[in-house]
Regions:
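Catalytic-pocket segment enriched in acidic/His residues
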Residues: 207
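Short glycine-enriched loop/turn motifs at secondary-structure junctions
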Residues: 253-258
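N-terminal leader/linker segments that precede catalytic domains of diphosphate-processing enzymes
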Residues: 2-182, 190-203, 211-251, 267-278, ...
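Short aromatic/basic micro-patch
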Residues: 264
Length: 292
């Protein structure tokens, strides 16, 4: 089962035929599929939630009310979290707005929260914590905390094509915890703390496609906003998307073990894959917005 609860897609990948001809999708089919996926990745904030605030009043996340109540009732974390005026205040005794002090507070609480089972994935990677109103980075925190606290993440997607318009798709490892066995973009991943999107996309292309040269990144970026409930909590992500044209004599090959296979398919094939649920929902919409 995939992260968004869709069963059986790993088996469906094995049954998909890359050799057959696929019909050209109509503009109506494209519009309907875009709308369908958009409804999945962008939800209204649920009613039974509370804002997550710093002691200085910075709004940084969103959490289900029942989880916030459970967390503040847990004696192990009574000094780190407090419910005040229908909001979850983190580190209520932290009276400074110093980013280093707030980062250290996140570091102190992250491992105990993980060990207590409040979130599952420990990534050992720091991401920027943003004030949702100003957009300013106010601290750094362990990546695993972000869905649990409903904090904003930023990511990059490299939509790779050949000069003839054929599109690269990468088969996600079946051992990945999120969307295993689905076909993704040429490269995609989180923007780490203090990293630009340009640096992040070059790093991801090197790690996932094995390319350090032999490609050209397009000049324009688009942003896909993802807001939805996930098993870990609330997913708030701004995904920055760029087009990448790969030279004909460059041959992408995964090097970090997170991709099992990289193929080059026609746009008609790609549409059929998206329509049949063989791509992650967010990646499917990235493809549709970028190529159709």
């Amino acid at each position: 089962m995939t992260a968004d609860g869709r069963p059986g897609f790993v088996a469906a990948v094995c049954r998909f035929s890359f050799e057959k001809d696929f019909p050209v999708p109509t503009s109506q089919q494209i519009a309907e599929l875009k709308a369908k996926l958009q409804n999945v990745i962008f939800e209204r904030e649920p009613n039974d939630t509370v804002a997550v605030l710093t002691a200085q009043g910075n709004r940084i996340g969103l959490m289900q009310s029942c989880i916030a109540i459970k967390l503040t009732a847990d004696a192990r974390f009574s000094e780190s979290f407090d419910l005040q005026n229908n909001a979850l205040v983190i580190f209520p005794n932290n009276k400074t707005s110093d980013p280093q002090a707030l980062s250290e507070a996140f570091a102190r609480v992250a491992r105990p929260l993980h060990d207590a089972g409040y979130f599952v994935q420990w990534r050992d990677e720091l991401l920027s914590v943003f004030d949702l109103d100003s957009g300013k980075c106010i601290a750094l925190a362990e990546r695993g905390l972000f869905r649990f606290l409903g904090m904003l993440t930023t990511s990059v997607y490299a939509v790779g094509t050949r000069r003839n318009g054929r599109v690269f798709v990468s088969l996600r490892s079946r051992t990945k915890q999120v969307d295993p066995g689905l076909w993704d973009a040429l490269a995609a991943g989180m923007i780490s703390a203090n990293e630009s999107r340009e640096t992040a996309v070059a790093r991801e292309i090197a790690e996932e496609a094995g390319l350090t040269c032999g490609y050209r990144i397009g000049s324009g970026w688009t942003c896909l906003k993802i807001r939805r409930t996930v098993p870990e909590g609330w997913m708030a992500e701004d995904a920055y998307v760029c087009r990448v044209v790969v030279d004909d004599d460059a041959h992408p090959k995964n090097v970090d073990g997170e991709v099992e296979e990289i193929r080059c398919v026609s746009k008609d094939e790609l549409f059929a894959m998206i329509e049949r649920g063989l791509t992650p929902v967010d990646t499917g919409l990235v493809f549709l917005n970028s190529l159709f």
